[in-house]
Amino acid sequence: MAIERTLSIIKPDGLEKGVIGKIISRFEEKGLKPVAIRLQHLSQAQAEGFYAVHKARPFFKDLVQFMISGPVVLMVLEGENAVLANRDIMGATNPAQAAEGTIRKDFATSIDKNTVHGSDSLENAKIEIAYFFRETEIHSYPYQK
């Protein structure tokens, strides 16, 4: 069993819609356990730093403004093949292209307000988790077989 960790963010639109619990339940139902979780209002510097890889892209400024428009839920999810599992549960970045039953299909309204973020690789998951969480803030618990 390949136990991994990945970063998940419930974006401001998810909080506005009141679907935090529904989103976390979807992760848990698929075997991803939140091992660190925090509600936080990102500063502009935090959002710019986190999304620095997109700095040259035309949507960067709007993305940063959206991410600082309200609080977010930052989570570390742990489970078997967590990175891929999280991405499957979230669905395609564009909710219009997302599969039925995915978070983005059910809760997102546009590619800009797509409700959740998830790490796209194990390498990036490690970087993204370290950006928001110290190792002492992340906890594990036993897995049921």
UniProtKB/Swiss-Prot annotation:
Family annotation (SUPFAM superfamilies): Nucleoside diphosphate kinase, NDK (SSF54919)
GO cellular component, one term: cytoplasm
The reaction(s) this protein catalyses: a 2'-deoxyribonucleoside 5'-diphosphate + ATP = a 2'-deoxyribonucleoside 5'-triphosphate + ADP; a ribonucleoside 5'-diphosphate + ATP = a ribonucleoside 5'-triphosphate + ADP
Its EC number(s): 2.7.4.6
Residues engaged in binding ATP: 11, 59, 87, 93, 104, 114
Necessary cofactors: Mg(2+)
Subcellular location: Cytoplasm
Keyword terms: ATP-binding, Cytoplasm, Kinase, Magnesium, Metal-binding, Nucleotide metabolism, Nucleotide-binding, Phosphoprotein, Transferase
Principal location: cytoplasm
Molecular function as annotated in GO: ATP binding; metal ion binding; nucleoside diphosphate kinase activity
Gene3D superfamilies listed in its UniProt record: Nucleoside diphosphate kinase-like domain (3.30.70.141)
Top-rank taxon: Bacteria
Record-annotated active site: 117
Annotated GO biological process: CTP biosynthetic process; GTP biosynthetic process; UTP biosynthetic process
The UniProt record lists the keyword ATP-binding: yes
Function: Major role in the synthesis of nucleoside triphosphates other than ATP. The ATP gamma phosphate is transferred to the NDP beta phosphate via a ping-pong mechanism, using a phosphorylated active-site intermediate.
Record-stated family: Belongs to the NDK family.
Complex and partners: Homotetramer.
Xref: NCBIfam families: PRK00668.1 (NF001908)
Protein known as: Nucleoside diphosphate kinase
Native species: Myxococcus xanthus
